[in-house]
Amino acid sequence: MGAKLTDSKAVPLDAMIDQIVDAHHHLWDLDKIQYPWLMARGVSRFFGDPTPIQQNYLASDFLDDIGDLPVTRSVHIQVGAAQPDTVTETLWLQSEAGRTSHGIPNAIVAFCDLTATDADKTLDAQAECENLRGIRQIVGRAPDTDAESATRLLLESPDWRKRLASLPSRHLSFDLQLIPEQLGAVADILAEIPDLKVALCHCGSPHDQSAAGLAFWRKGLTRLAELRNVFCKLSGFCMFEQNWDAERVRRTALTAIDIFGVNRCMFGSNFPVEKLYVSYQELYTTYLDLIDDFSGSEKDALIASNARCFYRLED
């Protein structure tokens, strides 16, 4: 049996803040764009059963999930469109932004295969969209998934490293999704590209929640955090445990904040994937509860201003 989508109105938000910038979410239109991973029926994924989200999720649906929360800006992250559709996805997102309040999604992180011979052409095409801010090419998802794909080989590709180093000249950042086993190797690569702004997705995906696994994750995270151009997204907390555990979220998020510092972390919803396990209201209530003892300026940094600055979002 598939997971049930949570009720977006089920949990009230008790803590009030001026504004939220959602640093990580997704949209999709299955009628216009091919998403092979999402459209495969009856296939379980590392984040759980995708059946409930195998339907269109447009900007209007995202806004409905947001409800009354003061989300004034958002950052869309590419979501695995089939290769011919990667630029089409960005063009569609730009059109969605033109139809929504506040222009959501205000920033677009698009896909480009940085190893492809036509990568520069793809980057040029993506740049036609005014909301483009960065590129994501996933380096690691989960150990079992990565063993069946070529993503783990990207770090060994000279072409990948060369094109990665070219992103700053295009005023583009890089969203980095990987697993803890790759943190050290990636840190070595990024140390050679100090002018590249990098956003680490999902706290570095701590898939092994054992004491040894968490210690290994913390060690890798600490190594990556030595690079001042790398920021950390506090998101994707249900990717491996497949339930919303506020205490686990608190422990993971506060560890990342302690390692990276308040000024280099930002919260994201990872909706609608996270919607499999939690409502938007409960998600942000948990986020605000875990930083309840922080100062007002620190809360704003984590909830809004860090993402606004990183992705160059206008007020």
PLM features: residue spans?
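Mid-to-C-terminal alpha-helical segments outside catalytic/metal-binding sites
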Residues: 1-23, 32-65, 73, 255, ...
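Active-site gating/metal-coordination segments in enzymes
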Residues: 2-9, 84-181, 231-240
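Short, well-ordered coil/turn segments that N-cap beta-strands
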Residues: 17-19, 69-75, 101-107, 129-133, ...
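Histidine-centered catalytic micro-motifs
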Residues: 20-30, 200-203
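Conserved, mostly hydrophobic/aromatic
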Residues: 24, 74, 108, 135, ...
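Divalent metal-dependent hydrolysis catalytic cores, especially in the metallo-beta-lactamase
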Residues: 42-55, 60-82, 103-113, 133-140, ...
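Acidic-and-aromatic substrate-binding clefts and catalytic sites of carbohydrate-active enzymes
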Residues: 52-53, 81-87, 112-120, 145, ...
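Catalytic pocket-lining loop regions of alpha/beta-barrel enzymes
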Residues: 150-266
